[in-house]
UniProtKB/Swiss-Prot annotation:
Residues passing through the membrane, by range: none
Disulfide bond entries: C6-C23, C13-C25, C19-C31
PROSITE patterns: SQUASH_INHIBITOR
Protein known as: Trypsin inhibitor 2b
Top-level taxon: Eukaryota
Swiss-Prot/TrEMBL site (Reactive bond) positions: K8, I9
Function: Inhibits trypsin.
Localization annotation: Secreted
Organism expressing this protein natively: Sechium edule (Chayote)
């Protein structure tokens, strides 16, 4: 089930697909 959540890792992104699992790319430029 862990892969269904957004891991609390600070990752830079330009789009949702840059992020892990259920993370989405926030306006701040980081996954969340």
């Amino acid at each position: 089930e862990e892969d269904r959540k957004c891991p609390k890792i600070l990752m830079r992104c330009k789009r949702d697909s840059d992020c892990l699992a259920k993370c989405t790319c926030q306006e701040s430029g980081y996954c969340g």
